[in-house]
């Protein structure tokens, strides 16, 4: 879904950047971040809580036994935690491309890859497959921070609005956690045998 959103938002951002309509550019960028939060954060919380059931439903057959479900669920837990950051980078990249800036996303991408490799190397020993997944989450977070910081450089982006959209994401996180608490205490009743 987020890839579709970023595909749709790029022409809008490009048109706004070329015409110098930075107010509309900011509005579209903030809208993209908010929609990303609205979709990815509840999906993250739900997947965190239902990861064992999801993995078992999709993969548990043949040689993929309970231990395989446990190991895959463990890695999924760390990987899905970075969904919002992965999704936000897919929205932030077009913001740079629309301004004909390919250097900033490239720098963020290179740093992100380096962070991913180093974190995976450091975490794989103690966390096994979960460490590799967590390294991806860490690198997505670092990439998001770098991209947001680099947005400030041009002076055309309303950083207050962008940062406020991240507060909007925090609100969605709190709401999702409240819903998640209910799911946590009722999932055995609802989904149990």
Task: Label the predicted regions.
Residues 1-193:
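Membrane-embedded alpha-helical bundles of multi-pass transporters/translocases
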């Amino acid at each position: 879904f987020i890839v579709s959103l970023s595909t749709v938002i790029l022409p809008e951002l490009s048109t706004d950047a070329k015409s110098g309509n930075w107010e509309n550019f900011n509005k579209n960028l903030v809208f993209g971040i908010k929609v990303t939060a609205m979709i990815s954060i509840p999906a993250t919380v739900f997947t965190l809580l239902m990861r064992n059931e999801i993995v078992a439903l999709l993969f548990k057959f043949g040689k993929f036994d309970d231990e395989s479900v446990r190991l895959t669920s463990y890695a999924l837990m760390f990987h899905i935690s970075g969904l919002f950051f992965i999704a936000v980078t897919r929205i932030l990249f077009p913001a740079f491309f629309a301004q004909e800036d390919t250097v900033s996303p490239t720098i963020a991408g290179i740093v992100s890859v380096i962070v991913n490799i180093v974190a995976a190397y450091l975490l794989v020993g103690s966390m096994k497959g979960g460490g590799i997944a967590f390294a991806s989450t860490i690198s997505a977070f670092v990439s998001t921070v770098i991209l947001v910081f680099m947005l400030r450089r041009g002076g055309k982006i309303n950083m207050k609005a962008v940062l406020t959209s991240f507060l909007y994401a925090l609100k969605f996180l709190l709401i999702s956690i409240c819903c998640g608490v209910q799911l946590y205490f009722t999932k055995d009743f609802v989904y149990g045998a």
